[in-house]
From Swiss-Prot:
Record Pfam families: HbpS-like
InterPro entries to which the protein is assigned, alphabetical: PduO/GlcC-like, PduO/GlcC-like_sf, YBR137W-like
Protein's organism: Serratia proteamaculans (strain 568)
Family label: Belongs to the UPF0303 family.
The protein's name in its UniProt record: UPF0303 protein Spro_1996
Length: 161
C-alpha cells in the first residue's frame, strides 16, 4: 500500500469507529480490553484513555519505562489538536515532506505524530476524548489500538499497512 491508500483506510477507521455513548465504565472496559490484547501479543505498552481532558484509565505494563508516559502525552496532544489519529497526521506530514513544527508551529516537545493515539468519536457529536498507547513501533501501536477498538465495538476493519 502507498500513503494515499493508507490515508483512505485511516479516514474510514476514524469515520467507522464511533461510539453511541462513552462514560467511565466504557473507558474501564476498553482499557482492560487493550491491556488484554497487549498481553496476548506479549507487548509492553502504556495505555491512557481521556474523556474531555480527564484521565479515566491509565495502565503502564511491566517492562515499560517512564518516558513512555511522555510519548502517550505527546500523541494524545496531536489527537486533541486535530481530532484525527496521530498516525494519520504523521502520514499526512510525511506525504507533504513536513513536520508538525514546520507546518503548524507545534513543538516536538509536546506533540508527536507517531501512531498510537486515536479520537473517541461520539456519534452525532465528534471527538470527545482520546485513546492513546505507546511502547511498540508506531504501526504496531496503531493497529493494536484500532483492531481492539473495532472488536470492542463489534466491527470489522482492515488494518493499515
Amino acid at each position: 500500500m502507498n500513503i494515499d491508500d493508507d490515508l483512505q483506510a485511516l479516514t474510514k477507521q476514524e469515520a467507522t469507529l464511533t461510539f453511541s455513548h462513552f462514560d467511565h465504565n466504557t473507558a474501564w472496559e476498553l482499557g482492560s480490553a487493550l491491556r488484554s490484547a497487549a498481553e496476548r501479543a506479549r507487548l509492553s505498552i502504556a495505555i491512557e484513555i481521556q474523556l474531555a481532558g480527564q484521565t479515566l484509565f491509565y495502565y503502564a505494563m511491566p517492562g515499560t519505562t517512564p518516558d513512555i508516559a511522555d510519548w502517550v502525552r505527546r500523541k494524545r496532544n496531536v489527537v486533541n489538536h486535530f481530532h484525527k489519529s496521530s498516525y494519520a497526521i504523521g502520514l499526512r506530514l510525511q506525504q507533504r515532506q513536513s513536520t508538525l513544527e514546520e507546518r503548524y508551529g507545534l513543538s516536538v516537545r509536546d506533540y508527536s505524530a507517531h501512531g498510537g493515539a486515536f479520537p473517541i468519536n461520539l456519534a452525532g457529536l465528534g471527538c470527545i476524548g482520546t485513546i492513546s498507547i505507546s511502547g511498540s513501533p508506531q504501526l504496531e501501536d496503531h493497529n493494536l489500538l484500532v483492531s481492539t477498538l473495532a472488536h470492542f465495538l463489534g466491527l470489522s476493519l482492515p488494518a493499515v499497512h
